[in-house]
Amino acid sequence: MVDTKNPGDKTLSVSPTKTLTLKPRVEQGTVRQSFSHGRTKQVVVEKRGKRRIGGDSPGPEPAGTSEPASARTPAAKAPPARAATPAAPRAGSGVVLRKLTEDERSARASALAEAKVRAEEERRIAEAEAARRNSKEGIEQAEREAAEARRKAEEERHRQEEEAKRKAEIEAKRRFGQTESKPAPAKTTTTTTRAAPPARPAAVAADGSDEDEAPRLVRRPGGPARPVIAPKPAAKPAPAKQRGRLTLVTALSADDVRERSIASFRRRTQRLKGHASNEPKEKLVREVVVPEAITIQELANRMAERAVDVIRMLMKQGAMHKITDVIDADTAQLIAEELGHTVKRVAASDVEEGLFDVVDNSTDIEPRSPVVTVMGHVDHGKTSLLDALRHANVVSGEAGGITQHIGAYQVTSPESGKKITFIDTPGHAAFTAMRARGAKVTDLVILVVAADDGVMPQTIEAINHAKAAKVPMIIAINKIDKPEAKPERVRTELLQHEVQVESMGGQVVDVEVSAKNKTNLDKLLEMISLQADLLDLKTNASRPAEGTVIEAKLDRGRGPVATVLVQRGTLRVGDIIVAGAEMGRVRALISDQGETVNEAGPSVPVEVLGFNGPPEAGDRLAVVENEARARQVTSYRAHQKRENAAASTSGMRGSLEQMMSQLKTVGRKDFPLIIKADVQGSLEAILGSLEKLGTDEVAARILHAGVGGISESDVTLAEGFNAAIIGFSVRANKEAAAAAKRNGIEIRYYNIIYDLVDDVKKAMSGLLAPTLRETMLGNAEILEVFNISKVGKVAGCRVTDGSVERGANVRLIRDNVVVHEGKLSTLKRFKDEVKEVQSGQECGMAFESYGDMRVGDVIECYRVETIQRSL
């Protein structure tokens, strides 16, 4: 290769005095423009030269050889074709290129092949991208079409609504005679169109053009300077004066049609409503729910009537009321029926509908076990008989060997294999309520009578309870193993109370048994099963449970516990239950054997855990569907309970006998007590016994009575009223005992109810006023009256009867009238002070603070004895 150097070639060199630069292609200059009114403006003018690629040409081409611009433009835009052979050397450069070798050719061929492969790969990628873009565009197109369809449907709906509104307006106008007047045809007038203003020149010469019309050039790097086109100014709004004017042009213009405002449409609607209200309205008959008491305003709202009309009707009946007054259900029903409405009477007690006594389906009824209550007099062997049947020993666990709770047990008959539920009731006089409760929930009563004791008062009471409950009886004549037993005497005594056994021609079954020797127990169970078969006891076990609370207590570790006898349905863990004013969810079920069970069927006694508070014994238990229903029932019952308590303690005027009894209780002394018991039944018995102790002078005042242990709040209450605390089979906790000791509050514990009643009776007897008894000592007659200076008047007397003692009480009697009562201060015989003067002797006597004594008066001497009373 030969390198040649021409003298005309420019050299590229690096020197310390010069920089590496390119020649500028743009020449700049300034031009001053002159405008009217003496204004001038200096404008920068650029002169841009054409950039040439290649060698320097000696001079510009002649005009004849140059091609037009339109012919050169496509050639300039077309891309240069790839040369298969190397390009020829530039003319005049003096460079000679060598020929390519075979290796270079093959390398270039492989490079071209690789370029083709890459181009093909890029083409496939571009096609895939185009296909993906097309699919995306298709989805977007479908979405746009769906949106367009929804928009059209919405427009169609709006159009239909507008059409319906327009038809309604036309119909309203037609009904009320408000037809719109047709607009008068517009007069055809010839208008002269204004000549368009002359167009402003786009550009002016440099010597006379306006500065605002001169185009501005924006130079961007790499491109020519382009003029910037200013945006067209927005049309100015018409002046405020001309905006409200109605001209011929605006009237004929379709774009400036005035639409009706919302306010005018609202006013027009109000006018139409006003006209429509003048028409007579149709009477709407409603079903009005009327409770037991309702205000006039609420009644008017439920009838959709005016309260004034209701008050006017009441005035016609002679009653003056305000809208806030409460009227009874009968008056509200009368008013509603006169106004043409139907009445539905409801009461607050409706929340209890459907809880009990729901009729069962005959297909779901199944046989159930009998419930047997054991009743009788105290110490006649009721619990011992049950122990013999259950093969247990409950008597040894009872305090004092007497039953003070209701117990419920299940026994399996050895002959038939059927289960029998036994309920053991106390036989003492204090437990009347327990026996009555046991008789209500039972199917059969076993009356236990001791063969050596006969019929006793509680035996008669049990007979009356069984007759009141209308349940059959089986007479169990117990203790036949004793030598003094006389069963025939028992049968004879029962005849006096209209109980005739089979051996005497009656229908009552009697069995002679011995609980101690377990004699004839199988025969007793057989008679119970036979009697149950005759009763044909059946129930539905698949329905929600119903039962009765036999006993309730507050256990410190387990909370409120209720002994429940399930009578219908099945009670399960998790059921929501209601008993009296208490509710809860069943947390656990414990059988009579102490085992935890998941469910309890009909005639099964269980202990239920989960109540919010201990219910009262005798309350009926029911399972409800949800807690909301349970809260409704319990709130109603609690409200009724509060109302009954308020009515019993209120000062309302009653009969004359009640007023007299209230006057007697004014001066009565109260013995304040706080009583806590283990179960509800024992608490009832204690309260009943203490209530019977009260007299017109003293009575037990029960400040608080509850089930559970003695707490610190009980001690605080007792301190405020100076009361005593009695715990029956319960104990005080550590804090309560410490507080009672600190404040001097007496806490007494009892396990036998009779000991409790006796101690309270003695304490109440101490509040009674003692009885004063007078004992006559003797009489003395005044013979003479002496006046002694230091002593006063002294009466000289002779004792006519009995004796006279110094310090005794005396009465001065004059003409058979008592004129003074006092004490004898001085008793002298001759001049000596003596303690006593016998009959027939003379003595001198002086009274305390009294000196009006006369001859012939009689002095009566007596002694007053104080005798303590008891209840």
Swiss-Prot record:
Residues 376-383 are annotated as: G1. SUPFAM superfamilies: Initiation factor IF2/eIF5b, domain 3, P-loop containing nucleoside triphosphate hydrolases, Translation proteins. GTP binds at residues 376-383, 424-428, 478-481. Its main location: cytoplasm. Residues 1-242 are annotated as: Disordered. Residues 478-481 are annotated as: G4. Residues 514-516 are annotated as: G5. Residues 424-427 are annotated as: G3. One of the essential components for the initiation of protein synthesis. Protects formylmethionyl-tRNA from spontaneous hydrolysis and promotes its binding to the 30S ribosomal subunits. Also involved in the hydrolysis of GTP during the formation of the 70S ribosomal complex. This is Translation initiation factor IF-2. It comes from Nitrobacter winogradskyi (strain ATCC 25391 / DSM 10237 / CIP 104748 / NCIMB 11846 / Nb-255). The lineage of its organism: Bacteria, Pseudomonadati, Pseudomonadota, Alphaproteobacteria, Hyphomicrobiales. The gene is infB.
